[in-house]
């Protein structure tokens, strides 16, 4: 897989957003590039292959030049051709990984990039609770939107796409002595467990363990159910993976600092 990564990477350090299995490019947009940084850093650590670290460093050069310095975090998801939360969240996580395995000025440089991207990512997150009308399911079950992130300017709902971002915030809080970052990580962590269905608290979900993907908190929707309800679009896999990362903190840092 990593050999394929090296083959796909462009000269400017970016990775194409969409490609076929024969490596022909469908969408050359580089907004998804930070998603490749994480496995490359992990691959370097596990296989001791410096090519993977060199590739990860090249992605950071692209991220700094085209995303972070311009505050232009775009099209990280496959279904949104626009600014989205995921691009800034993963840019912060990518440079966080690189800062964990570097020292001195290089470490500081990546840490500064992480901080800049993280603050932008935080602009997607709610600091208040959106009101719901009586009879709307989310309001009736007491759903609080603080700590949840909006998805993109195209897909205007909230979700639990967070993965290691709370870890990033806690680390930045220690690195820069900014307690408000770890404080908000705690808000995210406690708020995103609200809709986890268990016996006696099913949250409108039919089965224990499933977690809703599209949580609709505005009058905008995909045309299904509307504000205060879940959409019937449902990808149960990534929601569980995201929460798994959120509620097993410190995994990347523990592995990368062995």
Predicted features and spans:
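Glycan-recognition and catalytic cores of secretory/periplasmic carbohydrate-active enzymes
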Residues: 1-258
């Amino acid at each position: 897989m990593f050999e394929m990564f090296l083959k796909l990477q462009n000269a400017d350090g970016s990775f194409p957003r969409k490609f076929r299995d024969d490596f022909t490019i469908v969408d050359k947009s580089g907004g998804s590039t930070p998603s490749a940084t994480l496995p490359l850093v992990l691959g370097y650590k596990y296989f001791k292959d410096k090519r993977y670290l060199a590739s990860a460093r090249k992605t950071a050069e692209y991220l700094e030049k085209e995303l972070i310095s311009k505050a232009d975090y775009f099209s990280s998801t496959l279904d949104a051709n626009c600014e989205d939360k995921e691009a800034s969240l993963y840019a912060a996580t990518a440079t966080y990984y690189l800062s964990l395995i570097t020292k001195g000025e290089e470490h500081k440089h990546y840490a500064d990039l992480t901080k800049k991207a993280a603050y932008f990512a935080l602009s997607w997150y709610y600091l208040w609770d959106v009101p719901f009308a009586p009879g709307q399911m989310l309001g009736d079950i007491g759903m609080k939107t603080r700590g949840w992130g909006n998805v993109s300017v195209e897909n205007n709902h909230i979700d639990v796409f967070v993965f290691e971002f709370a870890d990033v915030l806690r680390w930045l809080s220690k690195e820069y002595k900014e307690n408000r970052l770890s404080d908000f990580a705690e808000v995210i962590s406690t708020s995103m467990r609200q809709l986890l269905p268990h016996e006696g608290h099913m949250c409108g979900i039919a089965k224990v363990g499933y977690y809703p993907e599209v949580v609709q908190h505005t009058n905008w929707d995909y045309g299904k159910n509307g504000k205060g309800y879940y959409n019937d679009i449902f990808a149960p896999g990534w929601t569980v993976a995201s929460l798994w990362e959120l509620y097993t903190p410190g995994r990347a840092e523990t592995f990368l600092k062995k």
